[in-house]
Amino acid sequence: MDTLKKLKFEANGIIGVLLDYSREPVLTNIIDQFRTSLESNDIELIRYSLEQLKTWYARNRNEIYKNEFVFNEFEHHETENKIKKFLDELPVVDETEKSSITHFSSDQNRELEKKIFISHSSKDKIVCNAFVELLEDIGVSSEDIIYTSSPYHGIPGDEDIFEYLKKHLFKGAYVFYMLSDNYYDSVYCLNEMGATWVNSNNCSTFILPGFKGEIKGVIDKNKKAFSLEEPIDLFNLKEKILRMYDLTLEDKKWERIKAKFNTKLK
């Protein structure tokens, strides 16, 4: 039996052990992607999904083994080893094969790398509207911003947001997580966080005014977040955007843009 057939045979067992332990949004999104990759025989995506499962185990292994309600530690040990073994045995897709199977041309990839997805709670629309306007004032085109609280930046009608992100933003789109108490109180936002984290390697975190909680979920706590109320963070954001889009901005104009944004935050 070849490796792919064996993986398909073992997949339900692997998924069952994982879902028996947790149905958190991050894990369920990885598993959905894993299932899709197996159905399409996409080796590159299968390897990517297995890498994500391997990373999930690395982050959660200690918690699993310390949990007094987990009675199948051996099954988790075996499942993690299976994931590693399949990664070792599955062929690596070389660059020639990648170029022939990818759904995106190089021009489309470069275009997608410019996209910014604003992951936010609709209850924070006023602050996030001001933030999107800030990005546009710095020089980001409205076409490069995906922001569902605005009809000018939203996802096309009849499109499922998660499927749209998987289908169109898989190749390098940047995600801006706009964290607030409203964000963490929303199951929808947490699901969105999981889906975008799985499908994007590029992200930045922003702390909205009044946020009283702590950074949780899949976001790296050790990666410094931008505070919208800190002048130095706004400056660093501006510099980041200018580098991303190869833009220039006069200091005097930036001061006017920053002042307008700060006024809208109050």
Swiss-Prot record:
- Which keywords does this chain's UniProt record carry? Hydrolase, NAD
Q: Which reaction does it catalyse?
A: NAD(+) + H2O = ADP-D-ribose + nicotinamide + H(+)
Q: Which residues form the TIR domain?
A: 112-261
Instruction: Give the annotated active site.
Output: 192
Q: Name one GO biological process term.
A: signal transduction
Give one Pfam hit by family name.
TIR_2
InterPro entries the UniProt entry points to: TIR_dom, Toll_tir_struct_dom_sf
Give the EC number(s) listed in the UniProt record: 3.2.2.6
The protein's GO terms of the molecular function aspect are: NAD+ nucleosidase activity, cyclic ADP-ribose generating
Top-level enzyme category: hydrolase
Q: Record's domain comment?
A: The TIR domain mediates NAD(+) hydrolase (NADase) activity. Self-association of TIR domains is required for NADase activity.
Could you identify this protein by its name? Uncharacterized protein YddK
Q: Which organism is it from?
A: Bacillus subtilis (strain 168)
| Lineage, uppermost ranks | Bacteria, Bacillati, Bacillota, Bacilli, Bacillales
Q: Which gene encodes it?
A: yddK
